[in-house]
Each structure stands twice: as C-alpha cells, then as structure tokens.
Amino acid sequence: MSKLFFVAFLCLIISVFATTPDEIGCTDISQAEFDEKNANCIKCGEEGFGEEMVKRCRNKCFTDNFYQSCVDQLNGVYEEKDTPPVKE
C-alpha cells in the first residue's frame, strides 16, 4: 500500500512541476491566474483525490464544472448535485 501511495504522490509532484498555461493549452490566462487556479487543483489532489483529480480540474483551462467543484470542496461548501433529495 505504501508503494502505491508513493507512486501516486510522485506522479502528483511531477504534474506540479511540469505545468505552465501554454503546456496545457491555456493561452488566454495570465501566469498569476494560472498559478492560483493550479494551486487549488493541486490542493484537491493532495486531499486524497490524486493525480486524476488534478488533471480533471485543469480541464478546459479551469472553466469546467469540475474546477468549481474542487474549489467548493476546499471551501467546505461542496454540495452533491446528483443525489436525490432526502424525504422526511
């Protein structure tokens, strides 16, 4: 289990160092804005969601709903949208 964790953590670290806006196709975003949004994605990955979370969070230059879900999760206001309402 520790080997699997190490590999996942290593992949996450590599993905952190290998990103600029141009590398993921975001040509209309400043480096400062990219760094801020990318840091949010990395935090989501570190929360136990892994490298796939980071990739999906960066999808479509952070304009995908997945990025907003990540930010909501970090802020503690995430609400599952696909679950049916609870009947009392």
Curated annotation (Swiss-Prot):
Gene Ontology CC terms: extracellular region
Signal peptide (UniProt feature, chain positions): 1-18
Principal cellular location given in the protein's record: secreted
Sorted UniProt keywords: Secreted, Signal
Tissue expression summary: Expressed by the venom gland.
Highest taxon of source: Eukaryota
Coiled-coil intervals: none
Gene3D superfamilies: Crustacean CHH/MIH/GIH neurohormone (1.10.2010.10)
InterPro entries: Crust_neurohorm_sf
Subcellular location: Secreted
Note from the entry: Co-purifies with alpha-latrotoxin.
Functional summary from the UniProt entry: May increase the toxicity of alpha-latrotoxin and/or other venom components. Is non-toxic to mice and to the cockroach Periplaneta americana.
Protein family per UniProt: Belongs to the arthropod CHH/MIH/GIH/VIH hormone family.
Entry protein name: Alpha-latrotoxin associated low molecular weight protein
Biological source species: Latrodectus hesperus (Western black widow spider)
